[in-house]
Design a protein with these regions (language model features):
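Metal-ion/cofactor- or nucleotide/acyl-coenzyme-handling active-site neighborhoods
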Residues: 1-257
């Protein structure tokens, strides 16, 4: 499979390559189709999952279990534009709560927060390792990376500079749905930290009457996980930036400043 990668970059085979590799290794293409069509898995994730199946291994990597100190408050940073638009207020809120860890669901806006001194946890699912390498340099990386429980269906990818500071969750205990999503990992991190107050920013939701398939999947995924988390956990999810998710408790971050 490694030999395919330079050819993929040259010829841009897109989603055809996973099918080609699956066929060459007698792996059911129906399963590959479900990865390509039904979920927003990255190309690299799909190829890695196929390679793991070819090699008959559960996963291509394993890391130590997360051992975390408790934290009463946790801030989860999503990928929505509100986490950028209201950054000055968010930064002020963070600095006023120095013991509050920051959990990044995605590294999309991680560079904005690089100078914030609070403990940082980066969720690595799907294409997030690649995004993290693009948006955060080794010099600006301070914190830990967090993976879903072993084994991971789509395999494991971690930036080389984070190899020694990467951990995996023992379990996703609050839901049986979407256990391989970044939101599930972030919410489980809050449980592991024994948080009683969970704040989120950047979970804007998707506007418009007609959503793309990816937007519909992600919107429903987040909605279900928020509901499951609040049903099974005492912590309330407070969104400090505007959000279309009705099951979040919407508050203005400016009231905390």
């Amino acid at each position: 499979i490694t030999a395919f990668m330079p050819l993929y970059e040259e010829h841009k085979w897109g989603t055809n390559l996973p099918y080609m590799i699956a066929g060459a290794n007698s792996i059911p293409q129906k399963e590959v189709m479900s990865w390509v069509v039904n979920r927003a898995y990255s190309f690299n994730s799909i190829v890695r999952a196929v390679e793991n199946k070819k090699n008959k291994v559960k996963d291509n990597a394993r890391y130590p279990m997360l051992k975390s100190n408790t934290a009463a408050k946790v801030l989860i940073v999503g990928g929505g534009n509100s986490s950028v638009e209201h950054f000055d207020a968010i930064e002020e809120f963070i600095l006023a709560n120095p013991d509050m860890p920051i959990v990044f669901v995605t590294a999309r806006h991680a560079s904005l927060y690089k100078s914030v001194p609070n403990r940082k946890i980066y969720c690595l699912i799907g294409n997030e390792a690649k995004r993290m390498k693009k948006n955060l340099s080794e010099e600006d990386y301070h914190g830990i990376c967090l993976l879903s429980p072993y084994p991971r269906v789509m395999g494991t990818e971690v930036p080389s500079f984070a190899e020694d500071t990467t951990f995996e969750l023992p379990a996703i205990s609050f839901t049986s749905y979407y256990k391989d999503s970044c939101t599930a990992v972030a919410l489980q991190a809050c449980i592991e930290l024994s948080a009683t107050e969970v704040f989120v920013v950047g979970y804007d939701g998707y506007k418009g009457e007609i959503l793309s398939e990816k937007e519909m999947v992600l919107s429903n995924e987040n909605k279900v996980l928020f509901e499951e988390f609040m049903k099974s956990n005492k912590a309330i999810l407070n969104s400090l930036t505007p959000s279309l998710y009705k099951n979040l408790n919407i508050k203005s971050i400016y009231q905390f400043l």
